[in-house]
Each structure stands twice: as C-alpha cells, then as structure tokens.
Amino acid sequence: MKPESSGGAGTVIVTGGGRGIGAAVSRLAGARGYAVAVNYAADDAAALRVVRDIDRAGGRAVAIQGDVSREEDVGSLFDAAERALGPLSALVNNAGITGGFSRLDALDADVLWRVLSVNVAGAFLCAREAVRRLSTRHGGRGGSIVNISSLAARYGGAGEWIHYAASKGAIDSLTVGLAREVAVEGIRVNAVAPGLVETELHAAAGAPDRAPRLGPSIPMGRAGVPEEIAEGVLWLLSPASSYVTGAILAIGGGR
C-alpha cells in the first residue's frame, strides 16, 4: 500500500531540483506544505543540501537520482517518489541544459541531440508519466504540471543558443497542447518562462558574468533571482490558479 503524502499539499516531483531555479522551487514547495522529491542527474551533494534545508524547515523531502531523458529512469523516479512520499499531486518539469554557446553553423550534432534529449524528450516523458498517474481517465485524482520554459523561446537565442531556445519553444507547445488534452481529466498544465536569472546556467554555458553584465539592459534594470521564479511556479501549482491552464507566465523583468 502506498503511504499517504506527508506533505499537506501533496507530493511534488521537481526535476533538476538540486540547483538554480529547481532548488528554489523545491525549497519553496517544501515551505508551502508539499512533500518534495528532489530529482538530480549527477550532483547528489547539491540535491542533498536542498533536502536538508527542507527537513530543517520542518518539511519532508527526498533526493532521487535519474536522467529524465531515459525512459526507464523516469519510471523509476516516479515510483520512488510515491513510495517515499505518497501519491503524486504535482510535477515541475525543470531539468534542462543549455549545451553552451554556439552559432548554429558551429553547433556539434552531439550537443544538439543531448539538449533535445534532456530538454524536450525529458519533459515529454515526465509529463506522460505524470498524466498516467494524475488523470481521472486513469483513476487518478487530478493535479498540476508546471513546465519551465524560457523567454529565449520568444527571442530565438540568435548568436548564443538557438538550440536551447528551440528546445524551450517545444516546451511551450507541449504546455498548450497537453493543457487542452487533459483539461477535463483534472490536470492543469502551465509553464513559467523566465528571462535573465542569476543561476549557474550561465557559468555552465561558459559565461559566468552574463547575468550581471546583461542585467542593466532589462527594463527593471537587473537580472532576476531563482526565488522570484519559484513564486510563479508555486502560484501555478496552487488552488489560487484553479482556472488557469495552458498559460505561459513570463517572468522577465519587463523584457
């Protein structure tokens, strides 16, 4: 028998939940009453730090390894989360990579396929698994999915990362299409599209100074911080957004 969720708001899986926006979402979800499954691909130390933070604040969390681009890992992730924390109520599709900066004519095909595998296939596989568990059509009790997109999908990433921007464009399509597909099955599907945010993403892409350098060009005059993005995610997960589905919430300081 599956345990009842130890979080008053239910169980949420946050993919890529150990760092950056994912870590902020995981911590805030724990503070808002969710039992949190903090997924990570390789950095177990970062994921365990987030789990400890949630535990110390009085919440409940577990760290679960899994590569979201691998179908078998996705199934194992969801099974482990429900065994440890109780029935799923929400998914935050956050795991993603940039593949680094490159013009398209210099882009390595292996990099392209890896970005699409993690950012697109990974999100689709996780959303599929969530629907199978949440949909009233499959005996579920409904729930919420929030995908992490990017304003890069709107602007295209020219000269930097068209490959990354295109992968986030796919997330926007997934959000709108799936929202309509499961709207009468008790599942809301939305996305948050962050703009320039101070995370490790920029350093991983090879430009650690990118956020402070470009911040003054944003209408609000600065880059965002992960906690600001997390607030949008938690609103979309919450009953306060009960009539919102298929929305792509831009959080970009006016960009």
Regions found by a protein language model. Give the residues of each.
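Alpha-helical segment proximal to the catalytic Tyr-Lys
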Residues: 132, 180-181, 242
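Short, small/polar-rich loop/turn modules that mediate ligand/substrate recognition or access, typified
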Residues: 86, 183, 188, 244-246
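C-terminal substrate-recognition "lid" of short-chain dehydrogenase/reductases
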Residues: 222-251
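Active-site helix of classical SDR
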Residues: 127, 167
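Substrate-binding pocket helix/loop in short-chain dehydrogenase/reductase
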Residues: 102-104, 108-116, 214
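Residue(s) in the substrate-gating loop at a strand-loop-helix junction
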Residues: 150
